[in-house]
Structure formats: C-alpha cells, structure tokens
C-alpha cells in the first residue's frame, strides 16, 4: 500500500477542534488496510493520539480467539474509557463484528 498523505487531517487541530476529544473507528474485512491506515493516522496526528488495535489486544496480548464472549472486549472497553479521559484522539481499529462488539460502540457516544 502506498504511503498516504494525511497532512490535511492535521488541520482538524487548528479549526476549532483543539479541545474536543475525537474517536476514529476503522472497521473492515481482513487485509483491507485498517491497521496501516490507523498507524498512518496516529503518526499524522502525533502525540496524544491513542491507537487501540483489536488484533494486538486479542491475538498478541491475550492470545484468544474472536467471538461473541471474547475476554478481549472488557479490556478494549477499559482502554476506550482510558483514551477518552487521557488522549485527544483515540483510533479504534479492527474487524469489530457489530454483533459481538456493540458494547464497545455504545461507549463511543
């Protein structure tokens, strides 16, 4: 995947949104580029940007399978809460099946 120019997204910081916390959710099929885009966005936005990656939590940290009652969900919820309190921008990325992760999306509102 080619390097993407996310410079225009940095303008969000100077157009009256400086003190607003933001949540970016990237969902999609496996191999669609979610993680690549999420990492590029985090780099473009710079410090105080938190990236929550479903695969990192589920596969790397907890080593559990995805599913309706995955133990990854409570940790992701806690990370979302932490990010809302402590980061200007939170990026959540993963396949994030809406039937299994609806509680996580409820935290976004």
Regions found by a protein language model. Give the residues of each.
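Short, Lys/Arg-enriched N-terminal segments with co-localized hydrophobic residues
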Residues: 5-19
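Pre-Walker A (Motif I) flank of P-loop NTPase domains
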Residues: 20-23, 87-88
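Hydrophobic anchor at the beta1->P-loop junction of P-loop NTPases
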Residues: 26
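P-loop (Walker A) phosphate-binding loop of NTP-binding proteins
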Residues: 29
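ATP-binding Walker
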Residues: 32
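Walker A/P-loop
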Residues: 35
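Conserved substrate/cofactor phosphate-moiety recognition/catalytic segment
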Residues: 38-86
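Glycine-rich phosphate-binding loop used to anchor ATP phosphates in small-molecule kinases
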Residues: 71-109
